[in-house]
Amino acid sequence: MSFNFLKDNNKKVHFIGIGGISMSGLAEILLNSGYRVSGSDRSESDLTKHLQAKGAEIYIGHNGNNLKDVDLVVYTAAIPDSNPELVKARECNIQTMDRAEFLGHVMQGHKYNIAISGTHGKTTTTSMFSHISLSANLDPTILVGGNLDVINGNVRVGNSEYFVTEACEYKASFLKFYPYIGVILNIEADHLDFYKDINDIQNTFLKFAKLIPNDGFLIVNADDKRCVEVSKQVDCNVITFGINNGDVRAKNIVFNNGRPTFDVYRNEEKLFTLTLNVPGNHNILDALASISSALSLNVPVDSIIEGLSTFNGAHRRFEIKGKVDGITVVDDYAHHPTEIKAALNAAKNFPHKRVFCVFQPHTYSRTISLFDDFANSFSNADTLVLADIYAAREKDTGVVSSTMLGDKIRENGVNCKNLHSFEDIVTFLKGELKDGDLLITIGAGDVYRVGEMFLEAK
């Protein structure tokens, strides 16, 4: 199926799992381009309601009868072959395509595809670059893995040759993309339910980098040795960034109330001084990646400064949820040991008396494969509360639990408590937190509800 938006928008596309953050964005891109769209999901959500209001046919629950006059069925990697809609589509010889391949087709309609990859920081960097591209009036189409205030959601449909998207390495999805600019923020062990080991992961990132045409750009973190190794094996232009190394660097970094100010240098030339509204060294690196990408497109420095100066953070990325009785409540999507350390480092740089952390591990496979790394991630928390593991797509086989992780963390000298329900966690926090303390909820599941419940309870 060819996706020439000017010629083929009489087609009807059905999305299985249309309520997901990426699938809903793709559906909205098609709706804005005049396609007929239908889709199903297990439950109603704000995203499904939004799409319905834009004209999509939404079905709650998966049923083969939901496929009505459909030309193409798009599904996510999480959808099993036994899904009744996928079964029906194949029985009826309706073309099917997974989300990544479909996104690749959409990207082919644009000349300048900016695909942002890495184990951590994809959503924040995509959001930062989106701010820059809007300030520069590039009129981009944007697809981001979280809600971004400046576009009032997770998708923006532009009318230019610029397409900005996250590029996820899970199940090697990003190998179906067509990047003109490919960003690799970092390469670490994750998704070990799919990859054999870290070398397998690095080789997959190399394959992604080799998708970039010779006149395109690979933007890589010079402070990450695996990124550097990848950059030495490509034929396209390479721009490196970093705090300690790189073509584009941050120097003279100072923190004020958690917010970093630094000078941006390209080689030995000072370009400008920048203050970010988001805390932590990891956000400096994400900003440098965005700046490097913008410089490769010859975006004016003034637009770069304006874009990053108006960026106040992506949702669920060190997001300040509120303040009550002098207690600041923050939420962060971190679900990998490196991300957790970065979030807690940002918390330490934020004005506080004590840092209370509530962590909900995400998936059994990730918890067991990175068990020791998780256990060593919480030294910057004065008190840690562990919630039960968020299963997501997995089943509990009894191999690992939050209690087991808590025992290991306590061996490392961290004040750690295991509690099983959010209600019990909130009750504990109400009795412990005092004026000047900072509460940070961490995890990719629904642990953000703890912060919301605490604010409501107070």
Swiss-Prot record:
Keyword Plastid assigned: no
SUPFAM superfamilies named among the record's database cross-references: MurCD N-terminal domain, MurD-like peptide ligases, catalytic domain, MurD-like peptide ligases, peptide-binding domain
Cysteine pairs bridged by disulfides in the record: none
Enzyme nomenclature, EC number: 6.3.2.8
A biological process term (GO) from this entry: peptidoglycan biosynthetic process
Keywords: ATP-binding, Cell cycle, Cell division, Cell shape, Cell wall biogenesis/degradation, Cytoplasm, Ligase, Nucleotide-binding, Peptidoglycan synthesis
InterPro entries in the record: Mur-like_cat_sf, Mur_ligase_C, Mur_ligase_C_dom_sf, Mur_ligase_cen, Mur_ligase_N, MurCDEF_pg_biosynth, UDP-N-AcMur_Ala_ligase_MurC
Compartments it resides in: Cytoplasm
Catalytic activity: UDP-N-acetyl-alpha-D-muramate + L-alanine + ATP = UDP-N-acetyl-alpha-D-muramoyl-L-alanine + ADP + phosphate + H(+)
Molecular function as annotated in GO: ATP binding; UDP-N-acetylmuramate-L-alanine ligase activity
A GO CC term attached to the entry: cytoplasm
Pathway annotation from the record: Cell wall biogenesis; peptidoglycan biosynthesis
Pfam families with a match to the protein in the record: Mur_ligase (PF01225), Mur_ligase_C (PF02875), Mur_ligase_M (PF08245)
Binding site for ATP: G118, T119, H120, G121, K122, T123, T124
Family: Belongs to the MurCDEF family.
NCBIfam families to which the protein is assigned, alphabetical: murC
Function field: Cell wall formation.
Protein name: UDP-N-acetylmuramate--L-alanine ligase
